[in-house]
Amino acid sequence: MVLRFEDTDKERSKKEFEDDILAGLAWTGLPYTTPAVPRQSERTYIYRKHIPKLIADGHAYEAEPGKDNPDKKVIRFKNPNKNVTFADSVRGEVTFDTTELGDFVIARNIDEPLYHLAVVIDDHEMGVTHVIRGE
């Protein structure tokens, strides 16, 4: 199991939440493979490298400034606007219409990547094949 702290949202990321997660894992005896738990906030240099390539390849674009940061343009993922089908280990074959999503923000600006970008890059780099999340 890979453990990392997804702390790109500074307001909702607190040390006590991390402590609770570590205590819960220790209590259950679930092992995790990362000796030093990586934090997304410490890996922004990695995510920043991918933004220009996504833009150059036509998968993302700079959009009008967001209300939270009116001086810098946000970076949006360019939605493919089609049906996407994939195999889910729990639900079986899942299909959804990406036209319902719109082009979502993946970075507050060229220097501030958000969770939606960071988590995909981390999953790929860390060899994650299965993800379990609460619903």
Listing of model-derived features with the role each one plays in the protein:
Residues F17-S41, H50-K53, A60-A63:
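A glycine-rich helix N-cap at a beta->alpha junction
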Residues D9-S13, R39-Y45:
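Acidic-and-aromatic substrate-binding clefts and catalytic sites of carbohydrate-active enzymes
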